[in-house]
Every structure is written in structure tokens, then in C-alpha cells.
Amino acid sequence: QHYDAAMSDAFFDDLGMPKPNVYLGVGSGSHAIQTAKVMTEFEPIVLEHKPDWVVVVGDVNSTIACALVCSKLGIKVAHVEAGLRSRDRSMPEEINRILTDSISDLLLTTSQDADENLASEGIPSQKIRFVGNVMIDSLLEHLKIAERSTIREDLGVPDTDYAVLTLHRPSNVDDRAIFSGILGSLIAISERLPIIFPVHPRTKAKIEEFGFKDSINDSNIRLIEPLGYLDFTRLYSGA
């Protein structure tokens, strides 16, 4: 739900992954619009290829949209990162997780507590498989490569004593009062510890909308463009 073309391309390039064979062209939008568009664009692909299984990953709008399409067509769904719960139903991701798990045929989990969450929700044990955390696998696979990045030198950040910030969840940045409170705390922290802030496009738009740019510029928070996977890994590993 936070799609940005430049950020998406950077991940494929950094991780050495082939570009998608099919691009649905949905982009950003409200939760309802994005979910509906993914469903209407994805269904013809499924009808054409007639897969036995479809694998969906994570907790974003495309996850639940594709799972719904397959469930209605009688195609089996495997959900990677199943069973994760925040217990906060105000989060769009939490709704996506719960609904996707409830209609998936194979639930691939990252941790024991995810298994326990699914069991407590009545998911049969034969549907649950603990497979580990693909995000950690990716990190370990690319950590040595990320060490070659020159991002810290390019930005001129010190070897130690700096923080890295990410902030983009709607619950944190869409409400002016909430965002202002978070920003006030960050500005106070930046007086003791400089903060490097790769700004997500939707957060950047909210900073402009709420008139926070001057406050940030007057602080020790440094705004930079979003980073690719390897540069970001190098940056936060030294923070």
C-alpha cells in the first residue's frame, strides 16, 4: 500500500532478482481502491495460467487481494509470514494478516509464536509449517555485500553516534497531532544524537502538507532520499 516505482526497482537491482514477468500497474491508492484494482488485474492472470498453487507474502493489500481471488476460484493459497499478530486491529496490516491466514491452505510461519497464534485461531496443525524468516535469510545472504556500500562515506556520517529513522505507517504520519508529537520527540533526541532520515514519499508529502519542513531543517535530523536495500543495510548496521 506504500508503492513507489523507484523504490521497487531499487530492490530488484540490489538483490539481483529478475524483474517481474507481469506488472499489474496498480500503484498507490486508498486501501479499497488498491485492493480492488489488484483483484481485477490479477484474476485474468490466474484464469490464463491456471496454477495449482499461488504463493502470497506478508501483510500488504496485494497479499489479501491475491488470496481472495484464488480462494474464490478454488486455487490453493500458500501464505509466507503467516501467523504474525500485533493485536492492533486499527492497523491495516493486521486485518490483511488475519483474513489472509483464514483463507490460506498452507501457512508458512517465521516463529513459534506465529504457530501458536494460528492454533489459537483454530487453524488445523496440518496446514501450518514453520519454515523460518525469509527477511533474516535475505539479510544474512547480503550482509557482506552491503559492507561494500559507500553510503556512509557518501553522506559524510560519522563512524558511530548517529541514528537512522524510518517513519511511514499511516497511524504515525497521517494525523497531524500524532506526527507532531513523534517529531517533537525525534527533534529532542537529535540534540544528543544526529538522525539520518531516508524519507518515504508518502511521509515526505505529509511533512509538506503539515508544514513541518522548517522544524526539521532547524534540527539535527537530516532528510535524504529513500535508499536501496544494500545502502540502507550498511547505513543502519553502523548506527
Model regions and ranges:
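Small-residue-rich anion-binding loops in enzyme active sites
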Residues: 1-21
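A nucleotide-sugar donor-handling region in carbohydrate enzymes
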Residues: 2-6, 25, 103-178
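Active-site and donor-binding regions of nucleotide-sugar-utilizing enzymes
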Residues: 11, 23-122
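Short, acidic/turn-prone active-site loops that include or flank metal/cofactor-
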Residues: 82-86, 133, 221, 226-229
